Amino acid sequence: MRLVVCLVFLASFALVCQGQVYKGGYTRPIPRPPPFVRPLPGGPIGPYNGCPISCRGISFSQARSCCSRLGRCCHVGKGYSG
């Protein structure tokens, strides 16, 4: 009798530890929402792309980002291409 009680207890404990008994509710951390993305500074923003209309006033890293993401590349004296 004691053996049966012990085995039932161990089996129920194993199920609780594996999470088989409680299938609903909070089981893992809630993922953090993505950070707010601000438009690049340096002039008016083009429609829906987040890159400035003009190449003036933007940093090298901003220009490189617009070029690699959207194909809008700044050229010296010419402005955007693409």
From Swiss-Prot:
The keyword Disulfide bond applies. The modification Serine amide is found at residue 81. Residues 1-19 form the signal peptide. Disulfide bonds join 51-66, 55-73, 67-74. It is found in: Cytoplasmic granule. Keywords: Amidation, Antibiotic, Antimicrobial, Chitin-binding, Disulfide bond, Fungicide, Pyrrolidone carboxylic acid, Signal. One of its GO terms (cellular component) is cytoplasm. The keyword Glycoprotein does not apply. InterPro entries: Penaeidin. The modification Pyrrolidone carboxylic acid is found at residue 20. GO terms for molecular function: chitin binding. GO terms for biological process: defense response to bacterium; defense response to fungus; killing of cells of another organism. Belongs to the penaeidin family. Antibacterial and antifungal activity. Presents chitin-binding activity. This is Penaeidin-3d. It comes from Penaeus vannamei (Whiteleg shrimp). The lineage of its organism: Eukaryota, Metazoa, Ecdysozoa, Arthropoda, Crustacea.
